[in-house]
Amino acid sequence: MYVRHLALTDFRSWSRVELELSPGRTVFVGPNGFGKTNLVEALWYSATLGSHRVASDAPLIRAGAERAVVSTIIVNEGRELAVDLDITSGRANKARLNRSPVRSAREILGVLRAVLFAPEDLALVRGDPGDRRRYLDELATTRRPRIAAVRADYDKVVRQRTALLKTASSARFRGDRGALETLDVWDGHLAAHGAQLIAARVDLVHELAPEVEKAYQLLAPASRPATVRYRSGVEVVEAEAAAGNSDPEVFEAALLDALSRRRDAELERGVCLVGPHRDDLELRLGDQPAKGFASHGESWSMALSLRLAAYELLRADGSDPVLLLDDVFAELDSARRQALAQVAASAEQVLVTAAVGEDIPVDWDARRIEIAMTDSDLGRVSVLSGVTQ
């Protein structure tokens, strides 16, 4: 799989750009703040419908513009697929597949399969559980696009149930049984959708575990062994996951029981205290959690291991995913740079950003695209300043 064409309109610092790409290695070179990362971000957005840098879409739209457009042409086993995404702040994205509109932008998920390495990856180790949940859900969705709908349905249930909890507390004191009966219904929805999401995550973690262990051993052979496991606030869910079981019916029953037991606490606080939106992917080095105990180098090795494991799972599913390397070589020591370069050597397409050419391995044969900034009627925008084959 590779990206043959990338076109952006009013995306970040780019007012308009069209790039013809090819298999092999391409390096986008330019000073920090000149827009090279925006190219990789656009491709990652096309693959996942999310940015690795911001949580909302508003910053993706160039200042002064009403919307941004990301267009790609993907080649997979000789077949071309064109994807167009219209990004409008505060509104649902619109998508086209081979120039035909699709009902939901989620329908384009899985067309571009990519793995991104970026400085933000340190948050997978040092950040909040939400960073690790997002990692799991993005990978699960890339491999099984239907999971995107499961996640969307679950998120909707959590929002609506949370709103109900905020009003049901006072209703209970008034003796209003209607609100509590409605809450029972939403408990069922949360348990059903939550169980499906947990099952997908648990299956994924079981496949990730040996790949993470292997990748970490490659990156840090003298360090402690790396392990991962799924953590849940529901004891039955965690025990079943640890035992290798991922039966949604078991998870659904466990969630319903936990919701019943935590009902009073939820009503008191007005938030959902049970469900996969509170779960975590635990990362351990030896007998210690990586978060809080891993050194800077160990944290980088663990973060890279998670991405390398994702790459190996996607490769095992079929065609090679596109590798996106955003300023990571400058962050790594020589051993980790070499390990990442070895993986990149076998990939069908690698797209890299670097502030200076010296950040790239010296033995790389790569096409080089220079990025610059210029002043225009639209303000300061990014432009292509040169291409070296």
Swiss-Prot record:
Biological process per Gene Ontology, one example term: SOS response
Subcellular location: Cytoplasm
InterPro entries listed in its UniProt record: DNA-binding_RecF, DNA-binding_RecF_CS, P-loop_NTPase, RecF/RecN/SMC_N, RecF_2
Pfam family, one: SMC_N
Gene Ontology molecular function: ATP binding; single-stranded DNA binding
Binding site for ATP: G30, P31, N32, G33, F34, G35, K36, T37
Record keywords: ATP-binding, Cytoplasm, DNA damage, DNA repair, DNA replication, DNA-binding, Nucleotide-binding, SOS response
Main location as per UniProt: cytoplasm
GO CC terms, sorted: cytoplasm
Known function: The RecF protein is involved in DNA metabolism; it is required for DNA replication and normal SOS inducibility. RecF binds preferentially to single-stranded, linear DNA. It also seems to bind ATP.
PANTHER family: DNA REPLICATION AND REPAIR PROTEIN RECF
UniProt record similarity statement: Belongs to the RecF family.
Protein name as it appears in the record: DNA replication and repair protein RecF
Annotated source species: Mycolicibacterium gilvum (strain PYR-GCK) (Mycobacterium gilvum (strain PYR-GCK))
Gene expressing this chain: recF
